[in-house]
Structure formats: structure tokens, C-alpha cells
Swiss-Prot record:
Expressed by the venom duct. The lineage of its organism: Eukaryota, Metazoa, Spiralia, Lophotrochozoa, Mollusca. Coiled coil: none annotated. It is found in: Secreted. This peptide corresponds to allele E1j. Has not been merged with other alleles since they may differ due to geographic variation (see strain in PubMed:19606224). The presence of a 'disulfide through disulfide knot' structurally defines this protein as a knottin. The cysteine framework is VI/VII (C-C-CC-C-C). It comes from the Eukaryota. The gene is E1. It comes from Conus ebraeus. GO terms for molecular function: toxin activity. This is Conotoxin Eb6.17.
Length: 26
């Protein structure tokens, strides 16, 4: 997983949590 990256879904976060508010991986 990684954090701080832009995302639209958890798939784009390598299954990390994707914040829908900021659209970033956390």
C-alpha cells in the first residue's frame, strides 16, 4: 500500500484506504 497519492477508489491505492473527501490514499 502507499499513502498520499491521488485516487478515485481503493484499487488505485493498492487496497489502502482512499479518502473520498480529499481523494488521496491514506
Amino acid at each position: 500500500t502507499h499513502s498520499g497519492g491521488a485516487c478515485n477508489s481503493h484499487d488505485q491505492c493498492c487496497n489502502a484506504f482512499c479518502s473520498t473527501a480529499t481523494r488521496t490514499c491514506v
